[in-house]
Amino acid sequence: MQLELSKEMNLPMIVHSRDAFSDTLDCIKNVGWNRGIIHCYSYGIEEARAFLDLGWYIAFGGGTTYTKKSKMEQMLELLKFVPKDRLLCETDAPYLAPVPHRGESNTPVLISHVYDFISSARGISVEELNETVDKNIKTLFAI
């Protein structure tokens, strides 16, 4: 229903999908609306590929900064895999505060930690990442 409304109104949809990849992908495909954000992304590269192939953006927040050591290599690969023109950063405030504030209430001011982590993983400057995300938001929301 919400995907259909988003499509009718020609607005991007923001989807939080946790442990429901197949169901989420099926809903998106069934409605045929390919303008949105997979918020608080928590899947792997293959799942990202499926969303990206449909035209969706992938958004990373504070949880990205405290990936388990055993999964850090996979996270770094994922952060490099997402194309520049589909990458977004977010706070998810008041939840999922980034390291070094994990366990505290999250606020937008802490987004710098997310930008530091992602720019380091991608081998780019924070300024370049900021420009990328700014451009992507403007494109997605047609502003």
PLM region spans:
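Short acidic/histidine-rich active-site segments
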Residues: 85-107
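Active-site micro-motifs of SAM-dependent methyltransferase domains
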Residues: 58, 95, 139
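Catalytic pocket-lining loop regions of alpha/beta-barrel enzymes
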Residues: 1-88
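Conserved short-loop catalytic and cofactor-binding motifs
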Residues: 12, 63, 99-102, 117
